[in-house]
Amino acid sequence: MKQTNVKPADGKLGIMVVGCGAVATTFMTGVFMTRRGLAKPIGSMTQYDKIRVGRGEDKKYLHYKDIVPLAKLDDIVFGSWDVYPQNAYQAAMYAEVLKEKDINPVKDELEKIKPMKAAFDKNYAKRLDGDNVKDCKTRWEMVEALRKDIRDFKEQNGCSRIVVIWAASTEIYVPVDEKIHYHLADLEAAMKADDREHIAPSMCYAYAALTEGAPFIMGAPNTTVDIPAMWELAEKTKMPIAGKDFKTGQTLVKSGFAPIIGTRCLGLHGWFSTNILGNRDGLVLDEPANFHTKEGSKLSTLETILKPDVQPDLYGHGNDEDTQYYHKVRINYYPPRNDNKEGWDNIDIFGWMGYPMQVKINFLCRDSILAAPLLLDLTLLSDLAARAGRYGIQRFLSFFLKAPMHDYTQGEEAVNNLYQQYTMLKNAIREMGGYEADEEID
């Protein structure tokens, strides 16, 4: 075991959530209930997973907190921004994800979380009509206002560290523009020039967080920190960044099942995925421009796992789209289901001598129940990374994300294979804990 330089998790950790809707309030309520011994944080890797450290006779399995100094749940303080002014208790009741009996025991704590005014541009989420919005004339004013929010929250709550995580709606798609998004100076100039076409509000949150010494996590598929200018800022401020898009339901299944097809050397003709979802996220994604952003995130999973150029007999012939497998993703807004998302996958595969077979997957899940532990894990592990001196893209957090960040300017591919991602996660924890990384089967 090596000596590590990870700083201890002393003092309070402020978790500032962009968005105070279903996901955020389910996360907050679960943490509060767990702290009181009234619930268990099931689904959280940081609270339940055990990693093998050492080999042979020295082998043992330990919780993350026994390997690295994680922040304690008792030390977490929540803050939030939202376009709607309702406090976290009111928002949790409105979302109807959790039963009233699971919210009321921590009503007093939830009521104290009153969302700050959001940095918002309705053109980026046309289906939202909240009025709890900052009056900013330019994108740079948004940045300055958000920076002040972070400073004030940190001081007022006596926090020693802050992490900012996006749990708000999906913005419209913003194509990466080399003239704006590749260099920090150009990004800052565009913010100051109020370039609303190329500078999304989410970029203002990320810029504000990083410049205030807080890691930033993008939980939606927005174009935000997955641009070279933000990587430059993360390097400059020595802050971790992670993204993008929480991997909760259908894509989690896809990233776990696609490797089975690939490992078994089966062929793929097509994969059709569709969902019904009735919460506010579904409402926003019912807008075509916003769905386009999400579609890109959900489609990106297969192409790095089942590669046509590596196995042309199984997955197609290079760039010839007529012979590649067909991959389609759809999300349908269906209010009666609220947060209880349902996903269907039809997978057309083929085996020995080309004979066809099918796989059908029907996942009836609860969107926010699956997302809440991801917020806990991503915030705690990003805080850990910052204290360990890790900055820039945190690839070891790919396990939790649909479209993991990677340096596409250098031809790097994202790692989407769930099992490879899990190895990356475990090895990062091992290394930060002073143990040797390895890829042995546990």
Predicted segments, located by residue:
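Conserved anion/nucleotide-ligand pocket segment
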Residues: 242-244, 248-319
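Glycine-rich, aromatic-lined ligand/substrate-binding cores of catalytic
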Residues: 293, 297-393
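Metallocofactor- and cofactor-centric catalytic cores in central/energy metabolism, strongly enriched
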Residues: 1-220, 224-236, 252-256, 356-442
